[in-house]
Amino acid sequence: MTTQGRAILADRYVNKGTAFSADERRRLGLDGLLPPVVEDLDTQLRRVEVEYSSKQTDLGRHVFLRALQDRNSVLFYAFLEQHLAELLPIVYTPTVGLACQQWSRIYRRERGLFLSWPQRDRVEELLDNAVGDLDVDVVVVTDGERVLGLGDLGIGGMGIPVGKLALYTAGGGLDPSRTLPVMLDVGTDNDALLSDPLYLGWRHQRVRGAEYDELVDAFVDALGKRFPDVMLQWEDFAQLHANRLLARHRDRICSFNDDIQGTAAVSVAAIVAGLGTAGTPVGDLRLVVVGAGSAGTGIASQAVRAMVAAGDSEHDAERRCWLVDRDGLLHDRMQ
């Protein structure tokens, strides 16, 4: 390792804090930068638990964990894995929704890649700035327009890719240094954010149409050029863009949309398992989906494919699926 001193402590992926041994401190120029006591991971975890327990609100706990993740990745994931069931609702839903709403007010330190529309001609440069000499295997990208059930949160939507990737490391073992959260900041139509003096995103109404595609295309091209084997996850895009972007880019880069495909895969797997337990053929399925957004339409489409795979015609399978939203049953004669 050629990095020395404060640069090591600033690198979240190599910083061990008080766990650096006496020999490591001498060799790496850390003497004088840390308290003299050398601690093992268990002792560090006890200190984290004491401080975490002192937080009075879920948002306060979320902010504390994010700060820990930003300074010491090993310690953060050790604590997360040790208390996974307790911490999942803090790191991700439901608390991450509040954190996204307050994102510009609780911002502490850089993480991931921010691409705003005015920077669309510098995408490759900004990607290089964000990743440095690291390799990236998994990217989660959002434009913040449909964050959970909270709507348009602009740049605050960055909390979702960060949280998702933390779960993938804790639950799936991904190397956190090989993951990248990305925010495509094309503006926001949320007037409260645009008028907030602390808002950190591009202060502009959302760019749409060909201009929107210009930034997304530049991002996908740059990402595929730098990391040809990367897996890209589209996250929390409005239905207007979700299916279209997936179709537009799925043959250009390995990608999927969790709201459309991930939710559908889990839901239809549960339906098929339930039908099997009940002894009911998949071809006898009658399905009503409440909610006709990206997830609802994705579930219906996946269910149709399951019925076709079981021997039904696509026409018959589609006739046994209904979608209901706030206006009632959807049909082709609606205005």
Model feature map: region roles:
Residues M1-S255:
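N-terminal ligand-binding/catalytic initiation module
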Residues R252, I260-Q335:
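Glycine-rich phosphate/diphosphate-binding loop of Rossmann-like nucleotide-binding domains
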